[in-house]
């Protein structure tokens, strides 16, 4: 019996995930995208989702609300929903995991998070990620990756994994700014540790566990994203540091004001506060970032 898989979002990570899952001959993969040319087969999303066993969400965070509205009336009650979306909802500041649990219940929701850069997956480099979900869902979803370059391990903290994805994007942006300022490896080590500490503190504000930060979903993904030439968060940080016009948007930059709004400015910790000041306050980046080292 084949696994009927639908990937929503044919961007970089959606396309890379499709290549990974195709390694398992038991997987039958369909793709839906807002661009009709990228859809396979060419069918409405509502129709495709009604004939799937596993739904993978690989869409930008700003599109998650609209996607849920489209599929929730048509998706099967036994379909598992796995999200790779790393962001925060714009209206009320909900995590992707919070929205999914609210609409579909906790037992069939999973968050796939870890160091799995799309470019490296496409090039055949091995990767490993956390599949944050219930025991039953993990038993059903994990075999999809059998024989592929991506291995998964279970994590019980769904909201923590989702929050880690949001926070690591913001801190990757900050570490990109530090790299653009050419602050050196010592400074990077200091700021990486500070980011880790702040993520652990902030995790409680997102219903997650501080220990989740020290998993593949947290520190593992943060290190990969903050140091890779393929990372949009890193690239955006470099542009901000050098006073260049932002030519593309990244999840870290988009999520930052939403996280600030959810937490409140008084609860901002030093590194996140510095990133907010530099990215959106247009303050002197070198002066502010060097202040973090004292």
Locations of regions flagged by a protein language model:
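NAD(P)+-binding Rossmann beta1-loop-alpha1 motif at the extreme N-terminus of oxidoreductases
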Residues: 1-54
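General beta-strand structural signal in soluble alpha/beta enzymes
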Residues: 83, 108-113, 152-156, 215, ...
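Conserved active-site and cofactor/substrate-binding residues in soluble primary-metabolism enzymes
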Residues: 8, 12, 16, 62, ...
């Amino acid at each position: 019996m084949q696994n009927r898989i639908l990937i929503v979002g044919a961007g970089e990570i959606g396309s890379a995930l499709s290549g990974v899952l195709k390694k398992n001959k038991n997987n039958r993969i369909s793709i839906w995208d807002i661009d009709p040319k990228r859809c396979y087969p060419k069918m409405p999303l509502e129709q495709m989702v009604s004939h799937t066993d596993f739904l993978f969400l690989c869409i930008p965070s700003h599109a998650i609300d609209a996607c849920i509205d489209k599929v929730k009336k048509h998706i099967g009650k036994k379909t598992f929903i796995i999200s790779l979306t790393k962001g925060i909802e714009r209206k009320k500041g909900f995590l992707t995991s919070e929205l999914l649990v609210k609409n579909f219940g906790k037992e069939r929701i999973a968050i796939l998070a870890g160091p799995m850069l799309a470019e490296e997956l496409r090039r055949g480099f091995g990767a490993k990620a956390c599949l944050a979900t219930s025991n039953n869902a993990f038993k059903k979803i994990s075999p999809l990756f059998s024989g592929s370059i991506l291995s998964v391990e279970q994590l019980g903290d769904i909201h923590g994994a989702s929050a880690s994805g949001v926070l690591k994007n913001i801190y990757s942006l900050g570490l990109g700014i530090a790299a653009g300022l050419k602050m050196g490896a010592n400074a990077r080590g200091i700021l990486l540790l500070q980011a880790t500490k702040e993520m652990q503190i902030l995790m409680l504000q997102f219903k997650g566990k501080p220990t989740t930060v020290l998993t593949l979903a947290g520190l593992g993904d943060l290190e990969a994203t903050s140091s890779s030439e393929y990372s949009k968060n890193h690239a955006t940080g470099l542009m901000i540091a050098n006073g260049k016009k932002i030519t593309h948007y990244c999840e870290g930059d988009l999520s930052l004001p939403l996280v600030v709004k959810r937490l409140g400015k008084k609860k901002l910790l030093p590194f996140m506060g510095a990133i907010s000041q530099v990215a959106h306050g247009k303050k002197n980046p070198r002066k502010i970032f060097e202040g973090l080292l004292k």
